[in-house]
């Protein structure tokens, strides 16, 4: 759990630095002050709302990705059977055997996760960018990647308990029993705090990769399309930029995502040794026992989720910005 002190320190530094910039902005000009104060809360609110909308719209695809990733574990008898041949086969079989509502198993903790993770992720990312540069035109890929990595690690670590519950509900489907709050309590009583933050390291690593790739790729693609004169600041530009960043994020994150999913699905049992002790250990074991392409299990549903998810998210986010709610 040594990751927390460093993350908390980074978070506090960001908060103090943001406060310092806001004070400085007040001293320089009223315009800059207004802009910085807006960045204090609007990206947080817009990011959270857009994340919830995108999560609900793409959740069935995310569930099939989880089922595909946890199956075929030769060293875990519970998930040794290969039940699903692909994304569409998984969708039809889940509907047939468990009912249509099973496609939304784990939706409650998923929405709760996005309300926290999505809110913090976008808010910190946008605030950090303004600490480095004041104008959008001055942003660079490197600056945006650094901001994305930091915001991804902080937000995913805070939201990890909701992710653990979502993964378990998705993997076990109709076999999972209990309410969301009751399940949180049950995990805490049986596995302790470590159970709620099980898989936090690969989760933070995946978030660092996904956010560190997706948000900068979106910003740079959008900036290039607009400044080059190819497109204006329109929904089509937002669509192309979000589609591109979704593909880039899926390619970069899938191996870590598979390991993260399996680690979170592990239960703490007396006398039982965890199959995967960490990200590197998980990748090496999967490669050894299941082959290299096991690291890209669930890639198509992962991409087909990240693509539409990012499209829905960024279009919703951009429209909320224009509405100036």
Curated annotation (Swiss-Prot):
Keywords: Membrane, Mitochondrion, Mitochondrion inner membrane, Repeat, Transmembrane, Transmembrane helix, Transport. Increased activity at pH lower than 8.0. sulfate/sulfate exchange activity is inhibited strongly by pyridoxal 5'-phosphate, bathophenanthroline and the organic mercurials mersalyl, p-chloromercuribenzoate and HgCl2. Proton conductance is activated by cardiolipin and long-chain free fatty acids and inhibited by purine nucleotides ATP and ADP. Chloride ion transporter activity is inhibited by long-chain free fatty acids. It is found in: Mitochondrion inner membrane. Mainly expressed in brain. Some expression in testis and pituitary. The chain crosses the membrane at residues 38-54, 112-128, 141-161, 199-215, 240-256, 298-315. Belongs to the mitochondrial carrier (TC 2.A.29) family. Transports inorganic anions (sulfate, sulfite, thiosulfate and phosphate) and, to a lesser extent, a variety of dicarboxylates (e.g. malonate, malate and citramalate) and, even more so, aspartate and glutamate and tricarboxylates. May catalyze the export of sulfite and thiosulfate (the hydrogen sulfide degradation products) from the mitochondria, thereby modulating the level of the hydrogen sulfide. Also can mediate a very low unidirectional transport of anions including sulfate, phosphate, (S)-malate, citrate, L-aspartate and L-glutamate. This is Brain mitochondrial carrier protein 1. The lineage of its organism: Eukaryota, Metazoa, Chordata, Craniata, Vertebrata.
């Amino acid at each position: 759990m040594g990751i927390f002190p460093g993350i908390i320190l980074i978070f506090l530094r960001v908060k103090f630095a943001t406060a310092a910039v806001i004070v400085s902005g007040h001293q320089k000009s009223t315009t800059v002050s207004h802009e910085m104060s807006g960045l204090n809360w609007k990206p947080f609110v817009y990011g959270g709302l857009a994340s919830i909308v995108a999560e609900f719209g793409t959740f069935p695809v995310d569930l099939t990705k989880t089922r595909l990733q946890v199956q075929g574990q030769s060293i875990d008898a519970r998930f040794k059977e290969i039940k699903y041949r692909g994304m569409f086969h998984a969708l039809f079989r889940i509907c047939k055997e468990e009912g249509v509502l099973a496609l939304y198993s784990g939706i409650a903790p998923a929405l709760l996760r996005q309300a926290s993770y999505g809110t913090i992720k976008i808010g910190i990312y946008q605030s950090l960018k303004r600490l480095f540069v004041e104008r959008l035109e001055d942003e660079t890929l490197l600056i945006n990647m650094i901001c994305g990595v930091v915001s991804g690690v902080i937000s995913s670590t805070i939201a990890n308990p909701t992710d653990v519950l979502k993964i378990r509900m998705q993997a076990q489907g109709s076999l999972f029993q209990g309410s969301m709050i009751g399940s949180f309590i049950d995990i805490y009583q049986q596995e302790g705090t470590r159970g709620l933050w099980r898989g936090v390291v690969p989760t933070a690593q995946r978030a660092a990769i996904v956010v560190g790739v997706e948000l900068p790729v979106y910003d740079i693609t959008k900036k290039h399309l607009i400044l080059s004169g190819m497109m204006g600041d329109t929904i089509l530009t937002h669509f192309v930029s979000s589609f591109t960043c979704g593909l880039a994020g899926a390619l970069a994150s899938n191996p870590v995502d598979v390991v993260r999913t399996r680690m979170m699905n592990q239960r703490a049992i007396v006398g039982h040794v965890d199959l995967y002790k960490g990200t590197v250990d998980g990748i090496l074991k999967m490669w050894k026992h299941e082959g290299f392409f096991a690291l890209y299990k669930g890639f198509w549903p992962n991409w087909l989720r990240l693509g539409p998810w990012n499209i829905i998210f960024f279009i919703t986010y951009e429209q909320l910005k224009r509405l100036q709610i």
